[in-house]
Amino acid sequence: MIFNSKAQNLIFLKNKAKSINVLPLLCFAFSEYKKNKAAFINRIINTFQSEVIVRSSAHNEDQTAQSNAGVYNSVLNVKPTPRSLAKAIKAVGKDYKHADDEILIQPMLKDIRVSGVIFTRDHSTGAPYYVINYATDGKTDTITSGSAQGKKLIISRTCKLNEATEEFPAERLLRATKSIERIFDSDALDIEFAFDSQKKLYIFQVRPLVIQSANSGAKISDAQFFAHLDALYKEISENAGKKTGLYGKRSIYSMMTDWNPAEMIGSRPNLLALSLYKNLITDNIWAVQRKYYGYKNVAPHPLLYAFSGCPYIDVRTDFNSFLPAGLSPKTASDILQCYLDDLERQPELHDKAEFRILFTCAALTTRETVQKRFAHILSQEQIDEFIGCLRTITNNVFAPVLPLYQKDIAAVKKLEALSKNFFAKEMCFEEKIRGLLDLCREYGTLPFAGIARTAFIGRQFLDSFSEKKIISKKNYRDFVRSIVIPSQKIQSDIVKLKDGKMTRKRFLNKWGHLRPNSYDILSLRYDEDFEAYFDEKSPYKPVPKKAEKYSFGKKQLRQIDELLAQEGLCFSAKHLVKCIKESIVWREESKFIFTKILSRILSLIKEYAHTLGVSEKEMAHVSIDDIMKQFKTTKAKKNFLIAKIQKGQADYAYTKCIKLPEVLTSAADIYCFAQNESVPNFVTQRKIKANIVAEDKIHNTNCCNKVVCIRAADPGYDFIFTKNISGLITQFGGANSHMAIRCLEQNIPAVIGVGEKRFNELRQAELVEIDALNKQVRIIR
């Protein structure tokens, strides 16, 4: 069908489908109106006795090639008086260019329960989903105007209606939508709708959906896509049952729990990045570290699964790995099931599980919190057993003589020297990569995991100091800001660079290995694109924040000592504070050390690919295991890699098109899910108002005094702190993520981990206000 103007499309629908409610309408050419305004206004007044909406219906709107949505005005709640109507019609028609551009008048619909827009395909990829954006605030234009945060429901076109959400009458909307698709002979539509309080459905607009890039350039038929979804459903279902050696009746999968892969490698990583993350951390290393620190041994179960290329943490396995090793099976099973039930009830906490769901140590408030949480689930004997096991772990982590994490620090200190010796050896490419990965695991990611665990426990102790009123929130903030970590030195060095006190060569020798996405071969290192990251000629210089001078007073230390003794902990307050500081410093230091080796591995792969005539973009679709396979001839290796590249590219086409929730509680979620509202983490207590700079514009925009939006919180993004930003917003990230810590140190207000939906709304805004104290972020315009 050839689509017409907004008004004509509604008239066509009204005439073809008597069962679909279209509000009464009156339309006329703006050019004709200007010839006899009084006659047309009288006609409107005679037709409508209540408030109306004056809408555009222009020649170049709602067409197949472009919708021009929002180009022309609509005026709501117009009183049926000559003056009000004339003013509204003028406002709508003032930008018209064609003689046949129309004015559309309809009565204002009152008593609205739900309003929104349904796309009959994903507008970015053309994938076969119904995507419903809706609001329940009683307004007709909340979604179309973007004036407030709405909700989103994603439904596969094969999903049975009874699988849809109960949020609003989804069955009725989908039935009407399918009828409209038949009438317009199109399955790519953009339909504006509303339900009144009686659940009566009204259609406000039907236009062709302008798809940005159908299937992202891949030729995937709907039948192929549905078969892919069904295969994925089977895969998830088979993984969800009971597993030997693990407590818990079922699995839940999350993109952001614990080792937060969505933050570190993205929600749709390339295969090389995904496989490197698994190799270095989630296949085995994470479990070895947990066992070493006194938690349950969950080997050989992997932590991370890739569903259609999207990384998910197996939450059941993860939560098992936080159970103390000494727990009796009955107690462990009861606690684990409680954890899973908590997350299923509150999936928005999936990136805060260690702070809001799990108990992983014995801090000063743990005993009373555990007692309250499990009072009706565990017996008192089980509660005492659990607290005792947590106490044992905590005493080992902060042991007065050689605490566990200090062995990890000693190990990571060896990595750089070992890697230098390794590079001096003569060996083939594959052996070099394999050897570097072995070194990086043993002396990099394994000790890093232990140090990071210690820092997490330290954070829980700091929280408990605050809860016990031993320190104020300001004391807490000043203490963290008093700790000097490696990334703070970048700011000092960029100032030296701009002042001519440091050469570029020296600067890049220290920091050149960093990439905004540490595991991604396509992410350029600082030394590969220096000008994009650091503009030496810019007059703006970072203002290094002075470290706060804060130390615990004698009274505070005495209070902590008394409480530590009451909890049966065998270390002193002074020792604990020292351990907390040291673990925070070395968590960041060890991250910088092992990512230097990781960056070198990626550079070697890139160099090797070029010798084979393969680009890094192609190599990104090959797993690290396949890259390390050896062949007798270079030609055989190249042919093998080309075959893997082709398969990887084909698989990635599905990865780009598929839509999955951040938390999977059931295999059925892949067919229908509501996009969960994330609970963001607010940093500092400051309030600012500033313009937005989206991630893709950072390199060619002056970011000074602006709020920067980035998806992840990777250390490679530290360069943004050299640009004197006013605030930071990230899609992914938890309360203890790298960027949360950096912003706290810099006293920069930040909103960490807002989730996909809110992030997309915020990055498209012009001006936002962050009120960290009241935990609010608002779009001003």
Provide a role label for each language-model segment:
Residues 1-19, 28-35, 64-67, 82-89, ...:
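Conserved divalent-metal-coordinating catalytic cores
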Residues 12-15, 23-29, 45-74, 99-111, ...:
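ATP-grasp fold ATP-binding core
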Residues 25, 611, 743:
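Residue-level signal for inorganic ion chemistry
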Residues 38-47, 699-702:
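Short amphipathic alpha-helix with an adjacent loop that forms part of the alpha/beta core around
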Residues 53, 104, 707-711, 728-729:
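Structural motif
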Residues 53-58, 99-106, 189-190, 405, ...:
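Short coil/turn segments at secondary-structure boundaries
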Residues 464-468, 487, 549-658:
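Extended, domain-scale alpha-helical bundle/helix-rich regions
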